[in-house]
From Swiss-Prot:
It comes from Haemophilus influenzae (strain ATCC 51907 / DSM 11121 / KW20 / Rd). Residues 425-453 are annotated as: Disordered. Pfam families: Gly-zipper_Omp, TMP_3. It is found in: Cell membrane. This is Mu-like prophage FluMu protein gp42. The chain crosses the membrane at residues 56-76, 385-405, 455-475, 495-515, 543-563. PANTHER family: MU-LIKE PROPHAGE FLUMU PROTEIN GP42 (PTHR38812:SF2). It is a multi-pass membrane protein. It comes from the Bacteria. The lineage of its organism: Bacteria, Pseudomonadati, Pseudomonadota, Gammaproteobacteria, Pasteurellales. Coiled coil: none annotated.
Amino acid sequence: MMANNSTSFFVNLAGNVSQQAARFSNSIANMANKNVSSLNKVSRAISAVSKGFNGLGNITIPIIGVGAAAGATMVGKSMLRTAADFEMAKIRMKQTFGEQGEAADAWLKKFATDTPMAFADTQDAMMRLKTAGIDPMNGSLQALVDYNAKVGGDKANLDGYISAISKGFIKGKLSMEEINPLLERNVKVFEILAKETGGKYTADQMQKMLQEGKLGRKAIHALLRGMGRDAQGAAKEQMKTWDGLVSNLEDTWTSMQARFMEHGAFDALKKELGDFVEWLNEKIDDGTLDDFPKTVSDTLIEALKNLKEMAKDVKPVLESIGSVMSWVSEKAGGYGNLAKFMGALYLGNKVLRNDKVQTLGGWGWSGAKWGYNKIFNRKKGGAGGLADGVAGALGATVGVTPVYVTNFPMGFGGGGGGGYGYDVIEDGRDKDKKTQKKNKPPRPKRGRGSVRSPVAAVAASAAAVPKVAAPVTTASSGVARSVGNGVKSLGRGASKAVPYLGTGLAVAEGVTVLMDDTTNTKEKSEAIGSIAGATAGAIVGQALIPIPVVGAAVGSYLGGWLGEWLGSEVGEYLSDPEPIKNELNGTINIAVKASDQLIATATQAKIQTNQQRDSLETAVQMGTLGMGGMW
């Protein structure tokens, strides 16, 4: 089924139409000239990194079996952090509960899964009650959690309950100092205590006993029992709500991660780290590393200087790319779609690297491959234009049909004659370039006042782009080699892949930031910079620090930090764009490339706006635009 796509164009054509048109075209051409050089450098670098990008996924996918981004995030951050937290939890529970430590740890995991409480919050509550002398596993914590759910309280409200009860138990009796926080949190203390006496005392009598200091620890136990009876099952009911289900899912996932790491992976990583620390201590003791700290320090300082020098050249490139990224994001419908495109790019890379050509929906496959080739300049000869690359990539990924605005006849404003514009739409099918060139009619000569095609300007400037500097080429090939080594190391032990997870984690978190609608341009730019910095830093660190694991790990995090700073600087530049004033006057001719099996139609309509003097008409032509005419 064909997708129903739409594209909006805003063109300032007020005043002298010919002059405004020329100015508009020149602005687009200038932007293209600045950006195409940077994008072609990045394009060639990406081509070299393609194997590395593919290999990075091969590291993460076998470990988790979900995908590159999810694998890097879970292994690099979530799973290791969870395993470390559970390890510390066992130690703390054993120290607090003594011989009951293992039983308390098992009870903790089950209780957190069965209630809206998170693991860390449950552990904290258990330890606070136990420290005060109250056994949390005898129903006390369940009573507090149920009552908190009954009144719709949050974690802070529950903390207030625990604090008041714990203080009273430590003192040995209740006073208004402990009762007031409970009353403020909707606990009917005296009514509950009176009910627990079986009607022997009234609420007023219980309040009088409090004033006389007669409500001791037995009264506190009675209060906890009464709170549990009064709110029995409230937490279980809360688990059926959306927030409760989300909380349960988080706890279940955390438990799953802990179990993954319990099957040897975490121990293997700890052993590798322990071996390195032991080796380092031996070298320090025997004097081998007397000069090592200075060597490492000098190396890192030199690397930082090199990265900062590189940053001076990278910053304007990032600014240019960032401007284009913002434009692409706007056309793609937001950074969320752009992040989906990045994910699809990885999958496309995996598929296109296979020797066997697969048929995936006829034209959809060829269109996807065409868009992919446009980005990576896979066509023989010169680099593809910026507009073609962007349109092809987005068209292949999210179904956007490439649309170009030609605006004016060739002779408009005193220029040459005949026909509409230049060849602004390129056929997606691969043809022999010599045949194409031979069949093309001669290009019309430009008049003095003619409008230059923005796409033609892009192609012209692309041909003049200088070669990528040697350091960039070296860095790109270094990524492929480093990641390739990471793939091989996976078979020898999961821990040896850790240095490469810095880059994978930066990619995964970057996609997460781009997909978050609440993040601003500066934060998105920081994410993009962090990805680039982590990759470059890992290469520099691996090359300069003679210890493989330490070199890549230190370099990736150093580079990630520097890249994030660079991205922040670029974000400041991008966060306050100048507003564009749009006035709708004139005639716009729109040429839309028709895909296979699409019926071409031609319409002309006058657009009415809220401005009285607007006179905007559109002429839409469907088909392939030729050199000397419409088709």
